[in-house]
Amino acid sequence: MRSVLVASLVLLASAAQAQAPAAAAAAPAQESAGAEAPDKDVPPAQDMAPPETPATPVPTCPSALPPLRSPIAFMPGELLEFDLDAMGAQAGKMTMRVQRPDNGALPVQIEAQTNTFFSKVRRVKGTAVSYLHPRTLRPSRYTEEATENEVRRTADVAFVAKDRSVKVDYVVGKRPGQYNYTYDKDGLDVAGAIYLMRQLPMKEGLPVCFDVYGIRRLWRLTGTVVKREHVSLPVGEFDAWYLTGTAVRLDKPKQKREIHVWISDDARRLPLVAVGTLDLGAVRATLTAYTRPGEKEKRAKKGKEELKW
């Protein structure tokens, strides 16, 4: 959960945030082996290593994302609440909130925090905000602030459509750094990507490909809208579109994250479930409540769930 979205990719949220539970699972093993805990003010080597140039570049996206459907399915005041599960155990909570327009942008905020159980080995609390264009839903800026076992991590990311650049200014512990990337056809962030996906013109077989920022790196997500299916959750019954794909880290293609997302097939286009798979298992975000302007709040009730994941 070093990037506030397991959810997310949100999808990617899944690709990015999923690393926190993985680290949590590894912590007990290190302790049992007698390994010394690293100085909390010294960032791990993998956090500070500059991006590499792979011998074989990741294939580019065949095409840009299709025109988005209208009208926009969400608006300021919408609040979505999720349970986060890692490797079969509840790991924490996450919220996604659409804020009021700010200087011509539509901010969307994601907050995530581990629960008491997971905090025994990995305490994580973080917030991310994506500033989206109100029509195209492309980001102009993305900010992130998280505390992980008392180590503070921040990132301020600027997206420039003119030259497709992504400038990353970050601080891990007390050490600042900067990365510069160039995205291919579409550049998103892990917080805003799920909102754009809600507006895709869903149909079976629709290809989806874009670059996404997460964990100070740029990833390329390639996927497909697989099919329309019925999903039963404690929060309600839904007909939903099922999307699946793989996120590949551009500077280190061997790092891949499998992603599965279900989005309701109705005017609300709710992100129902997002699953990211790791070597240790699956990390999942499940919608448990939603509040939308002009609608009655809906919360999960005890009941059966019908979903393959």
Predicted regions and their residues:
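Sec-dependent N-terminal signal peptides
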Residues: M1-A20
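Low-complexity, intrinsically disordered regions enriched in charged/polar residues
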Residues: V6, D184-V190, V225, R284
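Generic alpha-helical structural signal
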Residues: A7-L12, S32, P71, T182
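Signal peptide processing junction and immediate N-terminal pro/mature segment
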Residues: A15-E36
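Acidic, serine/threonine-rich low-complexity disordered tracts
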Residues: A29-A161, Q199-W309
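Hydrophobic, well-structured mid-protein blocks that either form specific transmembrane helices
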Residues: A155-R198
